[in-house]
Amino acid sequence: MGDPRLQHIAENFDSMKRDINDTFRFHCTQCGKCCINREDILMSPQDVFKAAQALQMTPHDFVQLYCECYLGSSSRMPIVRLQPRGSIKRCPLLKDRKCMIHDAKPAVCAMFPLGRAIRIDKEDAEKDELPPMKVEYIINPIDCGDFSETHTVRDWLESFGIPLEDEYFLKWQKTISMLSPRIQKLEKKLDDNLMDKIISVMYIKLYLDYDLGIDFYPQFVKNADGCVEMLKMILAMPNEEAV
């Protein structure tokens, strides 16, 4: 899926970077423009959990109603994104120009116009333990709202209750970085039928297998670590045992 926004970020990441004390000008006028012509609103497991809670439905039902699932072309990870609607590619959670889950909106929406990422060397991703990671912030192109307010990156994140060193975000990025190269190795080792089963288990454990009445993060850590250990175990098996 070649979304131009994601391609722009990949090609211009360094020039878009901002320090936590850097300032930017932006004022949200609640015009809803950032909720249309969007194909890049990816849902993390925490996003799915919070949205399902807000709408009082299971994670499975939320994904079935509002999302699309696919395999990342390069990461080979199961990915969940909000499924845009209609010719204007409207976010499915936009109703009467308002977000249906405003207080539980995906982190990528809450942070706009900021974005965040970590960068991990491919060699490090192959290791059992990753080196310490640092969250890097970027300013996305702004084509909505106005520029009547000035904010620092730090203040903007704090206003939405997003930690600068977000424990969950770091764990999720670490999980992706550890799973992705191992999935790619297994794709060379196993047949398509078995890979489909492995990906299905990962998708369920990472995105769906949660009790909404219990704190999310401990459940996520258990599920994420279980997926990593599963892939390590399968990779360690002789080919004939893994099949």
Q: Where on the chain are the PLM-derived regions?
A:
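Short loop/turn segments that flank or connect secondary-structure elements
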Residues: M1-M43, D47-V243
